[in-house]
Amino acid sequence: MIEFPVVLVINCGSSSVKFSVLDAASCEALITGIADGVNTENAFISVNGGEPAPLARKDYEGALAAIALELEARDLMGSVALIGHRIAHGGSVFSESTPITDEVIDQIREISPLAPLHNYANLSGVEAAKHLFPGVQQVAVFDTSFHQTLAPQAYLYGLPYRYFEELGVRRYGFHGTSHRYVAQQAYSLLDIPQQDSGLVIAHLGNGASICAVRNGESVDTSMGMTPLEGLVMGTRCGDVDFGAMAWIAQQTGQTLDDLERVVNKESGLLGISGLSSDLRTLEKAWHDGHERARLAIETFVHRIARHIAGHAASLHRLDGVVFTGGIGENSKLIRQLVTDRLKVFGITLDPLKNALPGSAGERIITTDDSDVPCAVIPTNEEKMIALDAIRLGKVHPAAAYA
């Protein structure tokens, strides 16, 4: 019997393993940490922001083993009742979170070519956890599944239909776990019923996306088949004319691999500013008179406002605009610049509410007479993953807290 059940949440990236341990009763985080530099000589683990310690083994199983040792040191190893995994891409196969079985692992492996950098890493985490935590139910939570409610007209590209039929080329969308969590919080904050509601959510971080949520379901989103489409991001270009890329290739002789690196790693805020992908650095530079930092920020907010307005067209009514993610939660400048560009909706920002720090938590930042309220809601993907694990996993009766 587990007296104090906890949920271990694992997010295996292309070179890191982020993890959290949450109290299963309250879903409050007890431990957070990261094993970084996986599969390199400099691999390390850091817990609760503490000093990094080198990993004895540098692969994913070594990272999970180090996490297990940290749990043992805190007498939590025997308390792990469930494990929730963030899986980057569920393709068209997974429309919701699911308990992990051998069949599910095989299905994830089959669709992993859609996200090779992340899905194979995710599976490495699943296999390592299976070995280190035998008998503990694991649950897969897909970054794409929330968007499986998109209609064909929202997910199809204007390409020959055979590419969709034969290759699965379509919009899948990402940040689904974040958009789903924030939408659920927004119904309470804005005092609106989920079953008759229209929200546009802006998840703004180094990666950024917009999602239109109608009656609790995603009906449109800005990211596409990959997380490259849509908004200008930290190092990703977002929407770009393919003809422009073809012209660059012709003029420079760059290969497809070269251009893929450019649009993913050298573009966005970094590419326009020539300075940094970090918005905090760019905001300071703008105030110091750096012209291209200003240009990068204004391009960033123009694209955000345009996508918010466009996504509102997928709703029957706009009940609220919600900002989340590291930038959405913490940058009063970005929220101000974006809402200034949304006056067509009758949005009126309250400067005092907007100026509150991110630590102020969930809050409405518009005036009482604003036609459409805007809010800040901190995302909590780890909590959403833990809640899904609790809802779907097999838990000892003593842990029947859901």
Curated annotation (Swiss-Prot):
PROSITE patterns documented for this protein: ACETATE_KINASE_1, ACETATE_KINASE_2
Active site: D143
UniProt: substrate binding residues: R86
Binding site for ATP: 11, 18, 175, 203-207, 278-280, 326-330
SUPFAM superfamilies cross-referenced by the UniProt entry: Actin-like ATPase domain
Example of a GO biological process term: acetate metabolic process
The protein's annotated pathway: Amino-acid degradation; L-threonine degradation via propanoate pathway; propanoate from L-threonine: step 4/4
Keyword ATP-binding belongs to the record: yes
Any GO molecular function: acetate kinase activity
EC class: transferase
Keywords tagged on the record: ATP-binding, Kinase, Magnesium, Metal-binding, Nucleotide-binding, Transferase
EC number: 2.7.2.15
Reaction(s) the record says it catalyses: propanoate + ATP = propanoyl phosphate + ADP
Gene Ontology CC terms, in alphabetical order: cytosol
Site positions (Transition state stabilizer): H175, R236
Amino-acid positions noted as binding Mg(2+) in the UniProt annotation, renumbered to this chain: N11
Cofactor(s) demanded: Mg(2+)
A Pfam family per the record: Acetate_kinase
InterPro entries noted in UniProt: Ac/propionate_kinase (IPR004372), Aliphatic_acid_kin_short-chain (IPR000890), Aliphatic_acid_kinase_CS (IPR023865), ATPase_NBD (IPR043129), Propionate_kinase (IPR024917)
The protein's assembly and partners: Homodimer.
Function: Catalyzes the conversion of propionyl phosphate and ADP to propionate and ATP.
HAMAP family recorded: Acetate_kinase (MF_00020), Propion_kin_subfam1 (MF_01881)
Name recorded for this polypeptide: Propionate kinase
Originating organism: Enterobacter sp. (strain 638)
